[in-house]
C-alpha cells in the first residue's frame, strides 16, 4: 500500500492500494495495479488474451482489397488546365502552416501519371481503388456557373484506366479540399453550401456515375468540423470560435451529405445501381482505469462526441441525448441563452436518418480517457 516514502514523504504513492493520509481512519482503496496483480496471481502468470491471439484463415472470395488516396495529397497540377484554388492551396501556401512549408502544388504528380499509378495498382492486385475528386478542379469557383471540362476529363481518363485494369473505382466527393471561392463566403459555415454540394454531386453523378458503383459523400467530417474549424490545425485554419463553429460546420456537413444521398437515391440509383454513404473517422476510447466510474464515463463521452457526432444522426436520427444534454447544460451554465449545438427540425431528422448504404469507418488508434476539469470553457474538448 502507499506509505511514507522517505524523503518524498506522502507526496507519491507506489502501493497497490491508495491510502488517504488526510483521513484519520486511513482508508485503503485498491488501485488498478491491485486488481491487475490479483489477476496475475490467479492466472499464475500472463496467459495471452483471446483478442491478442493471431487469427489464421482466408477472407471471402469476394472480399474487397483496395488502397486509398485524396486529391490534394497526390494530384498536383494545382493550377493546371483551369483548376480553381482550394482551401488547401491557400492553407499550404501560408507560411508556418505546414512543416517545412511543404505544399501539394506537385505532390505525387498523379494529374500527369494516370497510367503509371494504375500500373502500380495492378501490381498490387487490388480489386478497388478509392480516390477523391477535387471539387475546384471541376468547378473552379465551387458552383456550376462554369464547368471545367479539362478537369472532368482527367477523372474520365482515370476511371477508364482503372476499369480497363479490372479495378473498381470508389469515388469520394469531398476529401477536405473545398473551393476557396466558397470559403470566401464562409464555406461550411454558410448554409448555402448545402445546395452547392448537391449541385456538385449532381454533376459528378451525371458525368461519371454510369462507370462508378461505389461512392462516398464526405470523408471524415469530424476532421473538417473540428480540426479545420475548431483547432485550426488544418484548412481553412479557423480556431477563434472553438465552442460554436465546429458544431455549425458539422451540422451543415450532415445536411449536405443527406442531400447528396437522396439525390443519388432518387435520381440515379435505379439506373446506375451504385451504393453511397458517408465515411466517418473516430478513435476508440478505453477508460484509463477500468475500475473507476469517472474514467468509464469519460471513455463513453469520447466515443459519443467523436463517432457519435456524425453516426448518430445518420444511423439513428438526431444527435445523441448525451451530446445534446452535455452541450446544453454547459452552455446554460456559462450564461448563454441556448445550447451551442444547433438543433435539427423534425423534417431534417427524418431527412438525415437512414442516409447510408454501408458503414464507412476510418479508425487509426485508441486512446485512454479520464475526466479533465475545464471549468466553464466553451470548447469541444471541454464538452466531451
Where are the regions that the model predicts?
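A common structural microfeature
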Residues: 62-64, 111, 128
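Short, well-structured secondary-structure segments
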Residues: 127-134, 168-172
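Active-site region of glycoside hydrolase catalytic domains
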Residues: 1-98, 122-123, 141-143, 149-384
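Alpha-helical scaffolding within the catalytic cores
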Residues: 51, 113-117
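Active-site mouth loops of central-metabolism enzymes
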Residues: 99-113
